[in-house]
Amino acid sequence: MALLSPPSPPPPLPPLRRRPASPTLLAVATRPSSLLSLPHCHCGLPLPSTANARAYSRSSRRRRRVAASLGQDEPGVSDTAVAPEGEGDSEPPASSDGAAGDIASSAEQPEASPEDLEDIRQVKRVLELLQKNRDMTFGEVKLTIMIEDPRDIERKRLLGIEDPDEITRDDLADALVEVNEGRIPENRVALQLLAKEMTEWPDLEMEAPKKKSKPGKSVYAKATDTGIDPETAAKRLNIDWDSAADLDDEEEEDDETEVPSAVGYSALYLLTAFPVIIGISVVLILFYNSLQ
């Protein structure tokens, strides 16, 4: 009896090979079809060819432009038609950033009230007076406005006052800059506080005392003999010799003070004689006690 051999296993199948899709086929698959934009009323008609679809999309766009220029909507034409990629002269969509910029630029600021205009005039008037009477520049005025009173800081710290909506010194400085640039500040509360503070500027109308422009001696030259000839100094400084020679006389006249004749050198002699008088008195008292 012959032994039966087991059946041999089937030969292994070769692995499947996947061919990548052609770029042309992918482009065709992803390209939107113009037939999707046809209205529902044309669904029963036979599908047109590619050339007819392109011609139909172009005519649809032309009809939409004519209807838009006349302010009418043409019935039966869909507004969501997708034109084939790379064809037609369709206009690019408007950018959202550009539209937002146009809206922001067209937004008008609230009109200024008469009180705001009066506050602006007050601030400009104070700036002119400070520049004329105090010789202060705009930067110096701005720095002065930004300085906060330390007493207010300590009071707020002790009372625990923390208001995030409170007008700060930086807000006042920003309002001052906008007024100086000829613009109306957006923060009207800061404008009112700025006008109130600047109108209360101390001694605003008073002019600053003008210093003498005539040159004088330094403190060291007054206390020490520098050995500088006034005539030589006058030639080097390009000033008149007479005015240079009169410097010492004028300064001496300013330093001298009028003293009454009764309080002259006699007071000095009297103070010096006090110890002598006391010594003589002590000697006389001791001598008188020794005689007893």
Swiss-Prot record:
<keyword id="KW-1133">Transmembrane helix</keyword>
<dbReference type="GO" id="GO:0080183">
    <property type="term" value="P:response to photooxidative stress"/>
</dbReference>
<comment type="function">
    <text>Involved in light-induced chloroplast development and growth. Involved in the plant response to abiotic and photooxidative stresses. May be involved in the suppression of photooxidative damage.</text>
</comment>
<keyword id="KW-0150">Chloroplast</keyword>
<comment type="similarity">
    <text>Belongs to the Y3IP1/CEST family.</text>
</comment>
<feature type="compositionally biased region" description="Low complexity">
    <location>
        <begin position="49"/>
        <end position="58"/>
    </location>
</feature>
<dbReference type="GO" id="GO:0009535">
    <property type="term" value="C:chloroplast thylakoid membrane"/>
</dbReference>
<dbReference type="GO" id="GO:0048564">
    <property type="term" value="P:photosystem I assembly"/>
</dbReference>
<keyword id="KW-0793">Thylakoid</keyword>
<dbReference type="InterPro" id="IPR040340">
    <property type="entry name" value="CEST/Y3IP1"/>
</dbReference>
<keyword id="KW-0809">Transit peptide</keyword>
<feature type="transit peptide" description="Chloroplast">
    <location>
        <begin position="1"/>
        <end position="67"/>
    </location>
</feature>
<feature type="region of interest" description="Disordered">
    <location>
        <begin position="206"/>
        <end position="225"/>
    </location>
</feature>
<feature type="transmembrane region" description="Helical">
    <location>
        <begin position="267"/>
        <end position="287"/>
    </location>
</feature>
<feature type="region of interest" description="Disordered">
    <location>
        <begin position="1"/>
        <end position="119"/>
    </location>
</feature>
<keyword id="KW-0472">Membrane</keyword>
<feature type="compositionally biased region" description="Pro residues">
    <location>
        <begin position="1"/>
        <end position="15"/>
    </location>
</feature>
<feature type="compositionally biased region" description="Low complexity">
    <location>
        <begin position="94"/>
        <end position="107"/>
    </location>
</feature>
<keyword id="KW-0934">Plastid</keyword>
<protein>
    <recommendedName>
        <fullName>Protein CHLOROPLAST ENHANCING STRESS TOLERANCE, chloroplastic</fullName>
    </recommendedName>
</protein>
<keyword id="KW-0812">Transmembrane</keyword>
